[in-house]
């Protein structure tokens, strides 16, 4: 199995991509340290990992809190060792014109999406450097590569994650640490369907899929498989990359 004997710390694990990654990593042998502010979602993820036969522990964690992030990582490293960090927790904002985005909305998006990634990397790097190995996978977005009109705050945050990933990869590569990012297009997770009924979302998915050469939106498993690859030893000579997973949208 591709992550046999490894431990992965996964933020935003209570739903969506984080839950899919927790399940996929567990299927490949990883011990899962699942973190999220959503304790109900965490419990559901833990149950699903356990049903797969995986070992899992949970931490209620707001990634904006650097001290809490370090404490959770230190505890995981002491109990299990630590090999992979998946910085996946993230938020967006409603589509609106740039001038309508107020400071509170902007700050929340930047604090979770940028400071959260920063805090996670600062928490794990002492452990990774000491052992001379480790893989960090940051969840960015296609919006961080090509930009998304009326999602300028979100685009700003994810663009920062992409360039931060490249800079940090160059810095810590000599320490044996790899840092990569995934940049998904629209994926069927709670974030893009927020505020929509099942019927409304089904119609919206059909409309959006027309713009993708592969004629469908992404599923969480599509992104989780890419995360798994970048976290595994199969990607041992890959670092500083922002892997676009978008069904061909950006080339159409």
Q: Model-predicted segments: where are they?
A:
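C-terminal helical subdomain
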Residues: 181, 202-234, 238, 247
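Residue(s) in the substrate-gating loop at a strand-loop-helix junction
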Residues: 141
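Conserved glycine-rich cofactor-binding loop
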Residues: 7, 14-15
């Amino acid at each position: 199995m591709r992550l046999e004997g490894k431990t992965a710390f996964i933020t935003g694990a209570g739903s969506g991509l984080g839950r899919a990654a927790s399940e996929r990593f567990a299927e490949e042998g990883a011990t899962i340290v699942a973190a999220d502010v959503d304790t109900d979602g965490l419990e559901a993820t833990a149950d699903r990992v356990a049903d797969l036969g995986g070992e899992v522990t949970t931490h209620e964690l707001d990634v904006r809190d650097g001290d809490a992030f370090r404490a959770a990582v230190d505890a995981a490293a002491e109990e299990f060792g630590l090999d992979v960090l998946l910085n996946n927790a993230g938020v967006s904002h409603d589509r609106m014109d740039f001038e309508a985005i107020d400071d509170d909305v902007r700050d929340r998006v930047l604090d979770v999406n940028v400071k959260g990634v920063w805090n996670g990397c600062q928490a794990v790097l002492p452990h990774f450097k000491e052992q001379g190995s480790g893989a960090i996978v940051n969840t960015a977005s296609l919006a961080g590569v090509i930009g998304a009109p009326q999602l300028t705050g979100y685009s700003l945050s994810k663009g920062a994650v992409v360039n931060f990933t490249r800079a940090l990869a160059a810095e810590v590569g000599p320490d044996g640490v790899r840092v990569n990012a995934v940049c998904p297009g629209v994926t069927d997770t709670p974030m893009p369907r927020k505020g929509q009924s099942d019927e409304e979302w089904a119609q919206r998915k059909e409309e959006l899929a027309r713009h993708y050469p592969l004629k469908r939106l992404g599923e969480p498993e599509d992104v989780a498989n890419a995360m798994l690859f970048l976290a595994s030893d199969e990607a041992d000579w890959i670092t500083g990359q922002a892997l676009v997973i978008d069904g061909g949208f950006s080339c159409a």
